[in-house]
Amino acid sequence: GTTIDEMPLERYMGPGLLVDLRGKVLDNEPVTLDVLKPFDLKPERIRDKIIVLYTGWVEQAFGTERAYVDNPYMAIEVAEYFVGAKVRAIAVDFTVDKLPPGQPPQDGDCPIHRIVLPENIPLIENLTNLDKLVGREFELFALPIKIHQGDGAAARAVARVL
């Protein structure tokens, strides 16, 4: 896929659509299409939007040992659905892939990244303050540090409420 320094900046900013999943996704459980079904995420509604999945995970686990061990994660079917719907980006308040505890990622350990990034759909992970966007229309801006041939980078993410 496209590296951070090659990705058009427009992919990192645009209209957002927040999906409030608090209380609907448990620790160590995937966000599945069944979980998303009640939210009317038809392709024509989410095309070219930044989909923001809000589970409340960062608020309860950030800075703890649990943050990357017990996190909810994205099911492969959801990543494939978002790719097919041609979303602009996927933003979450957790880590999208479930990794083996206490080990750095190995080849093949990050299926969501391998599905989404080759389609030039950025993943924006571990967002905070999403409670301020519940029920509101907004634009999201999450511009990553430009790293030559990088496949990930820290970003300053901000939203403009409309």
List each model region and its residues.
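Active-/binding-site microenvironments in catalytic and ligand-binding cores
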Residues: 1-162
